[in-house]
Amino acid sequence: MLAAHSICKDACVVVMEKFSPELVYQILVLRKNIFTDPQKPIQVLPAIYEINDPKPDDPVLVTTNFSITYFSVANEVEGSGLPAWLVVADAEGMSVLTAWAAGKFDSESIAKAVKQFGVGDKVSKKVIVLPGHVAVLSGELEEELPDWEIRVGPREAVDLPAYMKSALT
């Protein structure tokens, strides 16, 4: 606890009585997180992520690469035990609504991600679930991806498991 306090107070050197890799790791993570730039969003790598070992007929969910959004969606789906493909589109680390308002998360960027990550080759049931807050993109996305069925999911990640059980099975 004293080491963490010293790190928070900008200590240059911390001397510890015992060396424990687990403790040192936590202190290093604390040190790194204290000095991150709050104006630079923390991002995840744009990619297609497999959650709960999805099969080709499982649904494809779409979100942005803002870390909090990604982890919210991924954790809810993983916790439900339902398999899904999660396409994370590059939105410069912005949340869904922020990226949509800034023109960084639109039908073109979603279609680009779907094509770039070869999603069509991984799935047999071509159904994409958009975040509920960007339902207005569904018509444009149908034009960008004519072979796909576009569905509008819930507005909040916490509602995804119930939506997936009722609307996608």
Where are these regions (language model features)?
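Conserved mixed alpha/beta catalytic, RNA-binding, or beta-rich assembly cores of soluble enzyme
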Residues: 1-120, 127-133, 139-141, 150-157, ...
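Short, glycine-/small-residue-rich phosphate/pyrophosphate-handling segment
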Residues: 169
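C-terminal amphipathic alpha-helical "assembly" element
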Residues: 144-145
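Conserved N-terminal glycine/acidic-rich loop preference
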Residues: 162
